[in-house]
């Protein structure tokens, strides 16, 4: 089984790439953000440390962490943000290592895709066989964010300023998936990297 990281800037189209992979190939897709959310729930590895750091004011009526309240608490406090990241990021990485080990032991899938915005910054190269960068020009990304999410230019500017530069992404990635000109071209690039529809091929074999 090959472990492939998928990263890229906001609006690049990672979700479409991952949906295609999950539907067409014998693989599993893990979203690091969703894994982090699970770890932040009551009973998760990050819950108690985060509550101890941020206080009970960030809890909702059911005792869970209200993500909007947490975001508001760290939005203008860089030091607090770093402390939150120091709790969450190592826990996510450990959880991912456990998932990788489990999938390799099962031996049922050909690929495991891990999506995370900070794969480069957090030093995930050591646990990945390849790193894919989903790339779209900034103008294309801005248009997508305005149209699909209703973001203002000011909000887009703030997000882009906090993301890794294109140069850094290009320097660290093994494969670039260009997503400037429609999904059919994206799918052809993926097929070039992975081959034909492996999931369909295996399913047809089992059904015969």
Residue ranges and their predicted role:
Residues 10:
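The conserved Walker
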Residues 37-110:
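ATP-dependent small-molecule kinase phosphotransfer cores
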Residues 6:
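Hydrophobic anchor at the beta1->P-loop junction of P-loop NTPases
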Residues 97-105, 111-147:
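ATP-dependent NMP and nucleoside kinases share a basic, alpha-helical "lid"
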Residues 27-40:
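Short beta-strand-centered segment that lines the nucleotide-binding/catalytic pocket of NTP-utilizing
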């Amino acid at each position: 089984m090959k472990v492939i990281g998928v990263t890229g800037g906001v609006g690049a189209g990672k979700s479409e790439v991952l949906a295609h992979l999950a539907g067409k190939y014998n693989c599993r897709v893990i979203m690091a953000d969703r894994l982090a959310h699970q770890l932040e729930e009551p009973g998760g590895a990050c819950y108690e440390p985060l509550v101890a750091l941020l206080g009970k004011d960030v809890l909702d009526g059911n005792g869970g962490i209200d993500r909007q309240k947490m975001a508001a608490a760290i939005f203008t406090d860089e030091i607090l943000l770093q402390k939150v990241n120091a709790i969450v990021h190592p826990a996510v990485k450990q959880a991912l290592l456990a998932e990788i080990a489990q999938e390799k032991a099962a031996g049922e899938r050909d690929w495991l895709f891990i999506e995370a915005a900070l794969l480069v910054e957090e030093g995930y190269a050591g646990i990945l066989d390849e790193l894919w960068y989903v790339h779209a020009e900034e103008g294309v990304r801005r248009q997508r964010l305005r149209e699909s999410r209703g973001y203002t230019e000011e909000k887009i500017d703030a997000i882009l300023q906090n993301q890794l530069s294109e140069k850094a992404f290009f320097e660290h990635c093994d494969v670039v998936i260009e997503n400037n000109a429609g999904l059919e071209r994206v799918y052809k690039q993926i097929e070039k990297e992975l081959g034909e529809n492996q999931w369909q091929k295996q399913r047809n074999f089992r059904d015969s």
